[in-house]
Amino acid sequence: MSEVRVKENESLDSALKRFKRSCAKSGVLAEVRKREHYEKPSVKRKKKSEAARKRKFK
């Protein structure tokens, strides 16, 4: 979990902005979206294969 300590004379907005940035950098939101619904292993393999194919042809 990301943790941000509010500095002296720092506004809440800037602390919140730093917190959001640290969450995005650590990949918390992406992980939450990925785990939101169960995905069968066969579907995971298919998506991974499709992504590799798209990268190859770009």
From Swiss-Prot:
It comes from the Bacteria. InterPro entries: Ribosomal_bS21, Ribosomal_bS21_CS, Ribosomal_bS21_sf. GO terms for molecular function: structural constituent of ribosome. GO terms for biological process: translation. Residues 43-58 have a biased composition (Basic residues). Residues 35-58 are annotated as: Disordered. GO terms for cellular component: ribonucleoprotein complex; ribosome. Keywords: Ribonucleoprotein, Ribosomal protein. Belongs to the bacterial ribosomal protein bS21 family. PANTHER family: MITOCHONDRIAL 28S RIBOSOMAL PROTEIN S21, SMALL RIBOSOMAL SUBUNIT PROTEIN BS21. HAMAP family: Ribosomal_bS21. This is Small ribosomal subunit protein bS21. It comes from Ruminiclostridium cellulolyticum (strain ATCC 35319 / DSM 5812 / JCM 6584 / H10). The gene is rpsU.
